[in-house]
């Protein structure tokens, strides 16, 4: 697990916090064939009670157990047996689980939505943007940038 800190160009404010950077954890899962899956989790003390340090500790504490999982069924069994632990570390688990799902899709050469029984994504995609609770002038400037980029 690697931590990721990316500074914002301007502070981002919402009801729970004001932040000057994003913090995330990245997990890399590798198969015996050398394929790599990546997963990300965003621990937030004010949302999940997690920190980057606690997510890293969760990963260090259980990595050896996950390494014995040879299938998604094994990982699901581990998750079921440790549901309370996962509930206390949801962002850390998200990074692990997403890395495993990404790897599974690559191993099967299928998009993960197909592997999980869905239909392949297609068509035009819509992206969203987030506006924080900054000063009105900053809010307005960012809104104009988003509108110019095609966000509606």
Regions inferred by a protein language model and the residue ranges of each:
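Metal- or metallocofactor-binding catalytic centers and their adjacent structured scaffolds
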Residues: 30-107
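Short, low-complexity, polar/charged sequence segments that are solvent-exposed and flexible
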Residues: 17-21, 46-48, 56-60, 146-150
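Metal-dependent enolase-superfamily TIM-barrel catalytic cores that perform enediolate-based chemistry
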Residues: 114-152
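Generic beta-strand structural signal
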Residues: 25, 92, 108, 123-129
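N-terminal amphipathic alpha-helix/helix-capping segment at the start of soluble metabolic enzymes
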Residues: 1-3, 14, 20, 80, ...
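Structured beta-strand/loop patches that form or line metal/cofactor-binding pockets in enzymes
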Residues: 1-37, 42-49
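Generic detector of short, locally flexible boundary/turn motifs and exposed helical patches
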Residues: 1-6, 78-79, 90-95, 118-122, ...
